[in-house]
UniProtKB/Swiss-Prot annotation:
UniProt xrefs under Pfam families: Ppnp (PF06865)
InterPro entries for this protein: Ppnp, RmlC-like_jellyroll, RmlC_Cupin_sf
UniProt GO MF annotations: guanosine phosphorylase activity; purine-nucleoside phosphorylase activity; thymidine phosphorylase activity; uridine phosphorylase activity
Gene: ppnP
Protein name: Pyrimidine/purine nucleoside phosphorylase
Family per record: Belongs to the nucleoside phosphorylase PpnP family.
Length: 93
């Protein structure tokens, strides 16, 4: 069954599911800046909109747009800014 998650007072919502190979979530972010933590390695693909990300170990922001993926290792924290309402697919390894 699906599990619905809500973060940052409802500004970020996701639905967890199992792909053929990995657990995943598909979600949406309202405009804003957020800090996330990982417990597993995450492959995050922007489905629509754009996300500006400061990855662990970097102080440089990178912008990812539709179809682009970034990777965050397990047990890390990272910052994301959504300049517009955006959606994503995140697979966990």
């Amino acid at each position: 069954m699906f599990k619905v998650n809500e973060y940052f007072d409802g500004a970020v919502k996701s639905i967890a599911f199992q792909t053929e190979t990995l657990p995943a979530t598909v979600g949406v972010m309202a405009k804003g800046s957020y800090e996330f933590g990982t417990s597993q390695k995450e492959y995050m693909t922007v489905v629509s909109g754009s996300l500006t990300v400061v990855l662990p170990g970097s102080d440089k922001a990178e912008t990812f747009t539709q179809g682009q993926t970034f990777i965050v290792e397990a047990n890390q924290r990272f910052n994301v800014t959504a300049d517009v309402e955006s959606s994503y697919l995140c697979c966990y390894e």
